[in-house]
Amino acid sequence: MGGNAVIGCHCHTCKSNIRLLDSTNSVKGLLETALEMNYKGLAITDHEVLSAHLEAIQTVRSMKKEGEMPQDFKLILGNEAYLVDSLEEVRDNYQPGKTKFPHFLMLAVDEKGHEQLRILSSKAWENSFYTGTMERVPTVKKDVEDLLKKDPGHIIATTACLGSEVNIYLQKIMEVEKNDGDPELIKEYKLKIHQFITWCIDVFGKDKFFIELQPALSEEQIYCNKKLVQIADGYGLKRIVTTDAHYLRPEDRAIHQAFLNAKDGEREVDSFYEACFVQNVDEIHERMNYIDKEIVEEAIQNTLLIGEMIEDYTIEHEPIIPKMELPNFKLRHLFKPAYDKYEYIRKMSESKDDQDRYLLKLIEDGFENKLLKNDLTRDEFHKILSRINVELGELWEISQKLNQSMASYYVTVREIINIIWDDECGGDSLVGAARGSAAGFLINYLLDNTQINPMQYDLPHWRHIHKSRPDCQS
């Protein structure tokens, strides 16, 4: 790798729009444009959301298979988090216009690193709260520190954009300098920057923490870039350059602006996102001509270095069916006289998996409470058992394919629904409506997952799930 090549280490897709309109890039469009700009790799770093990663993996694999992408193209999976000192500072002492949620970029080196990203992202969403209509999802430094110090070396971090902690304080210094302000205030801001940089070095290590420059033309970005060059030299850190792509190319800027203003017409977006597109090496050099060309070139080459540090891995895996801890139970074998006639009822009763047997126990209870009546005829009894047998057959065959018990899914859903209804959870919670196909499954009715007997309405079970196309909705 080298020459006129670069890796885009900071790029956004439309998945960044989960909380705030942000990017017009599709995963496929972003990758195609990166190739057109001679990129040797690309990082997906959406704003506190990892949901584009699987699509990116599958798209890259498909493009390589079809010969649309070089085999050595490097996909990097990352996250742009909102890194804060403490939850109390930003949530409990929030001040409109003053409280900051600094941006921070993290890239997974390997599968373990991606697991760490997922843990931190989940924690950020657990921390979520609203300021007006804006949902905040802060990542607390202590959580990053505690997690990564247990198993370091799996995540690369960068200082991110103008919205990052280091750049927020650099811009404060710029304002003080403009106004011939208090040198003690500048000293205070410099100390904040020092504390942030040393924290990053301590948590991520010098070799996995990079100073990020960006080729925007704003006064603030130019000032910060010049200072960031000095900071990198002062702490012995490597620099990279990123374009923080939120749209594909300059001709898409107007569309991106209209998209962002569609929800908030007063939001100023034009100058802020002026440079946030997929830029080639020549465009980067042209925009950063106020910095020595060798420094910019080295920063570009360091993006390729990051690519070399990233391992090839996938986050794909076979479906994992949720499984809850079961209470003590005893199967009554209510249907034992019919075991010979109904293969899958018998198989569930004899299963070595306690989830299978527990599901049958719940079916027994539901049958007794809901369907067993004094005037139940023999034909009606066998129609019910035949339906139960067919539905259990679907679950059994899928379980064999997955080597996991499908029964545990229904048992777990039942428990979740019971928790929602439980007075101990507040007593005022509602179970939301689903797509509807779950109502066609008699077992759901017997477990109280649904409240409609599908046999009364001739609802087919296969609309809900079939061994040829598993699909659970409840």
Segments predicted by a language model, with ranges:
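Alpha-helix C-terminal capping segments
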Residues: 36, 62, 419-425, 442-451
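Non-catalytic structural connector segments
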Residues: 2-5, 166-169, 173-181, 186, ...
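Extended substrate/RNA-proximal surfaces in nucleic-acid metabolism proteins
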Residues: 2-41, 47-216, 223-235, 256, ...
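Phosphate/diphosphate-binding loops
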Residues: 74-79, 85-87, 100-103, 240, ...
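Generic recognition of stable, solvent-exposed alpha-helical segments in well-folded globular domains
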Residues: 29, 48-51, 55, 112, ...
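A glycine-rich phosphate-binding loop feature that marks nucleotide/adenosyl-phosphate handling sites
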Residues: 245-253, 304-306, 316-333, 437-446, ...
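Conserved short loop/turn motifs at secondary-structure junctions
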Residues: 44-50, 213-220, 247, 405, ...
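Conserved phosphate/anionic-ligand binding catalytic regions in large, soluble enzymes, centered on
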Residues: 113, 240-249, 428-451
